[in-house]
Amino acid sequence: MILLPMVANAYDIGVKNEDGVFIYYNYINDGSELEVTYYDLDYNIYKYKGSVVIPEEVTYMNRTRKVTSIGEMAFYYCTGLTSVTIPNSVTSIGKRAFYRCKGLTSVTIPNSVTSIEKFAFMDCSSLTSVTIGNGVTSIGGCAFSDCSSLTSVTIPNSVTSIGDLAFSGCSGLTSVTIPNSVTSIGRCAFYGWKITVVISLIENPYAICGKADEYDRTFNLNTFDDAILYVPAGTIDKYKTTEGWKDFAHIEEGEPTGISVVRNAEGDKAVIYDLNGVRLSEPKRGINIINGKKYVKK
């Protein structure tokens, strides 16, 4: 008798979408709904690639079911995936769902999604734009860690918790907006080297990991020392006495004008940057940031 190797399938059904792309699903919730999954147990025989449009519902064997979840490792290491459309029927994005999808440049997470699990978009190194829907309540640990092309993040006011290392290693990240709804910020959540503006809309600040927490700092030392922390009007004294937040060298009330700036402690000496936050030895033609204020040189 000759034994032939067999592939163990990790899916319940595979159905072509309208673009002719096979998408694989598992039955969930007693078979009433579908979850997007991968093809095989080794995650490597079939790879999603190009543009993938996930449908809101799938009809199979004369029965129609909603697609409500993107399962754990569904698009794991699909480096050829360039775009994905997530429908409004999806409520959760599982662990490592898009881990190391290095060709993915942007993603829109619809308002129907309530949770983004751990490592969901970790190391998507080409990801420059993320739109997080207003239904998301939790962003898991390392969810966007090492997304090195991501430059800014606005977290919607539906989010209550941001996990450990959620945006750590995002070396291109220059600005972060944290809504008042957030009640928990994990260790090293925004540990990125280039953050120049932090906008906190939290009206009653609570302790976060500060400069003394060597391995757990919510932000790195450069951010604490050089970035500007913008806080709601009337709250600056609270921030200056709250653990972690008080470590910011530059705290101002109100919001910036939409420009990313950097300020450091050099007394009255002029500190000059261009609009991209690059430090200049002298003003150049056009708009310059000098000691945190915009000036025009003709």
Which residues are covered by each model-predicted region?
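A recurrent domain-boundary module in secreted/ectodomain proteins
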Residues: 241-258
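Short beta-strand/loop segment at the start of cytosolic alpha/beta domains
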Residues: 11-44
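Residue-level detector of functionally pivotal "anchor" positions at catalytic/ligand-binding pockets or at interdomain
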Residues: 254-276
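Bacterial Sec-dependent N-terminal signal peptides
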Residues: 1-12
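Structural signature of tandem-repeat unit edges
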Residues: 29-34, 46-69, 79-92, 102-115, ...
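C-terminal tail/sorting-segment detector
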Residues: 287-298
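Consensus positions within tandem repeat domains that build extended binding/scaffold surfaces
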Residues: 72-74, 94-99, 117-122, 140-145, ...
